[in-house]
Amino acid sequence: MPKKVSKETQQLSLQISHTISCSLADSKPYCQKIFSSSIACQPSYIRKNGLLFTDDSLQWLKSLCDNSVDLIFADPPYNIKKADWDTFHSQEEYIQWSLKWISEAARILKPSGSLYICGFSENLADLKHPAMKYFSSCKWLIWHYRNKANLGNDWGRSHESILHFRKSKKFNLNIDEIRIPYSEHTLKYPAHPQAESSQYNNGKKSSSTWTPHPLGAKPKDVFEIPTTCNGMGEKTKHPTQKPEELLRKLILASSKIGDIIVDPFSGSGTTLVVAEQLQRLWIGCEKNEEYNSWAIKRIDTIIPRTIEQWITFDRENSKRRESIR
């Protein structure tokens, strides 16, 4: 029996039903370069900077053209039986399915593009090696959080992993957009010569001095960002929703204004919301209509801020969290 959708979903579906008949060519000029002429479905939601589709992710990815998008963020099922869309019979079946959509993701990425995949370390460890045949390199990132209780009788989970696949050696990475605050020790001694014994000076005396970068230190491969929780304005009922702060870091790192961001498992819309905040073009796909209704509501109620204000917003939140520990 089909799952019943909420009244909110039905109301939002009625509000956007008139967009279903719009053609892709008429709705967004850049779509002509991204979608093949054989695309089967029309967008469920159209906005100036983006499109949202209700469709199966793998089939939908096949409708996108080669070398057409700048960045893909994917938060696929984790094979942990957490929802009715996460019911693989075995890890082998899960890996084979994952490689199918990853190959399509690699195909549609521009040579300078990146694919970020979020998941549990034990799954991504099985996936990384076979997926590398589609990419030039990969960086393993850690999203660490402190605000989840350990409700079991085992090691409590306090992180998820993110694989950063790069299609070529000439991938985009905007270091200055994602710099982090220096430590108190560094700021206490802001200018100093490299000591003769320093590993960075090769045992040679140097008269040159090091000074902190005005935007902060270079980013590390561990991000400490809380999970979404009750009381946060962005929180929805989605069981695996990712925080906007995490997506802002990744999108700022690997794209620029006007780039095309794709999320083939867009869920409650965090990637789309953040792309809209940061003045990127975006295209999302999610087969669950209720999740799409939550995404649409979030996109329609975005608080207007400049990119610089969003960066400052996240830095101030990070400092606040540090100060109350």
Please provide the spans of the model-predicted regions.
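Cysteine-dependent PTP/DSP-like catalytic domain, specifically the C-terminal lobe
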Residues: 290-325
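Core catalytic lobe of class I
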Residues: 1-34, 39-294
